[in-house]
Amino acid sequence: MVVGAFPMAKLFYLGIRQVSKPLANRIKDAARRSEFFKTYICLPPAQLYHWVEMRTKMRIMGFRGTTIKPLNEEAAAELGAELLGEATIFIVGGGCLVLEYWRHQTQQRNKEEEQRAAWNALQDEVGRLALALEALQAQAQAMPSLSALEELREELQEVRGQVCNAHCTSKCQAASSKK
């Protein structure tokens, strides 16, 4: 996620940064007061940072092989506390970005699962409708056609006509035999 692209994300990041500053200040104060914290946690990174910074500056200016004096303990403790505070702010901000990324990925995964479920439901519905269509087509083919019905109707009328004629002639013969 690019922080510059979304104003809300940028505001959120700045808010987290502002909230983490008091935490960083407390860590800095604890680093300045505690001998153990100062000696083992603040001084080594500060001296390393000072050494890398001075070495880089010397190389840029063209000086080679110059020994770099370490910082005095007070300056190193101050620099170490500042580095620790900035690292805390960076870690909190980075953690927020990672959590936002995970949240976005979870939302994306859920959205894809919903789409997949909807797709499967649509495929099932299409399959069910295809079976219903086949059943209706089979019923339509099993039904006699209109021309067959017309033929049956004509045959029925012929039979009726024959029955009527036979019935009428038998009545006529019966009536004539009674006379």
UniProtKB/Swiss-Prot annotation:
Q: Please name one Pfam family that this protein belongs to.
A: OPA3
Supply one GO BP term: regulation of growth
Where is coiled-coil annotated? 120-143
Ordered alphabetically, the record's keywords are: Coiled coil, Mitochondrion
Residues spanning the membrane: none
Give the protein's biological function: May play some role in mitochondrial processes.
Can you tell me which family this protein belongs to?
Answer: Belongs to the OPA3 family.
Name of the featured protein: Optic atrophy 3 protein homolog
Give the organism, scientific name: Mus musculus (Mouse)
The encoding gene: Opa3
